């Protein structure tokens, strides 16, 4: 993991959102799969605080056992991204590398590291643990998620209704913070199971955009935004490049 933010100067990167953590493990899984190698994700103490010691293992449990390992380093204070890589190498991991994105580099993107852009073009479409005893899902449905910690990314009720009118014939199963079902609100394995049974995922730029990339083909992920293209996150630009539908059929 990178130790410092690519958008804020000299700011520790803590993987604060669910999407940050899902993205990191999906990226690690894809790298290991495509390079036929074991992957260990090294974390700083800022990536292992608050609720994160419980969150990381929950996300890992969605992936094949042993495909990705994580190791937090709680006693080290990195002074830069490369300093953290050098520290990991000194701990005996001689092949440790930093991560960069060559397609949409951010303002403080590191200069050294492996360009991981191509590994996000793979959509593994994993299976999920059978949760059918816990969930009574419709026969034909889409998973939907609108809530976000960012008001800029959220959709108001009028936009939601306009978008969902495109999906006539499908029932709506809401996942995430607005779900009525507690399991679909708080349990990733149940949300994952619902996604594997859904025809499409419909939503916004959020943690569930990243989670959907574990289970859906890109053309079956439909993301909507009211932001102009020059305000999109690098995740949104990359999603469009990789075949995810953005604002499809909405003017």
Write out the residue ranges for each language-model feature.
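N-terminal pre-catalytic "stem/leader" segment of glycosyltransferase-like enzymes
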Residues: 1-58
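Hydrophobic beta-strand segments of well-ordered beta-sheets in folded domains
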Residues: 2-11, 36-41, 66-69, 91-98, ...
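Donor-binding and catalytic core of enzymes assembling or modifying cell-surface/extracellular glycoconjugates
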Residues: 18-26, 148, 156-157, 161-242
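A glycine-rich helix N-cap at a beta->alpha junction
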Residues: 44-96
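A nucleotide-sugar donor-handling region in carbohydrate enzymes
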Residues: 74-141
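Conserved donor-binding/catalytic core segment of Leloir-type glycosyltransferases
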Residues: 138-151
């Amino acid at each position: 993991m990178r130790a410092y933010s690519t958008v804020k100067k000299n700011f520790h990167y803590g993987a604060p959102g669910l999407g940050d953590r899902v993205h990191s493990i999906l990226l690690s899984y894809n790298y290991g799969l495509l390079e036929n190698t074991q992957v260990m994700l090294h974390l700083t103490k800022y990536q292992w605080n608050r609720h994160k010691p419980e969150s990381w293992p929950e996300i890992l449990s969605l992936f094949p056992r042993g495909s990705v390992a994580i190791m937090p380093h709680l006693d080290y204070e990195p002074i830069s991204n490369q300093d953290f890589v050098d520290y990991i190498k000194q701990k005996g991991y001689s092949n440790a590398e930093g991560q960069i994105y060559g397609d949409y580099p951010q303002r403080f993107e590191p200069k050294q590291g492996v360009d991981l852009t191509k590994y996000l073009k793979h959509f593994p479409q994993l299976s999920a643990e059978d949760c059918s005893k816990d969930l009574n899902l419709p026969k034909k449905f889409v998973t939907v998620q609108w809530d976000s910690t960012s008001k800029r990314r959220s959709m108001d009720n009028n936009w939601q209704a306009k978008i969902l009118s495109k999906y006539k014939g499908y029932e709506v199963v809401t996942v995430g913070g607005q779900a009525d079902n507690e399991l679909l609100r708080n349990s990733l394995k149940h949300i994952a199971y619902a996604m594997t049974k859904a025809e499409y995922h419909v939503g916004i730029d959020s943690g569930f955009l990243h989670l959907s990339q574990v289970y859906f083909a890109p053309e079956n992920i439909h993301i909507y935004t009211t932001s102009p293209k020059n305000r999109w996150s690098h995740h949104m630009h990359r999603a469009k490049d990789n075949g995810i539908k953005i604002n499809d059929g909405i003017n």
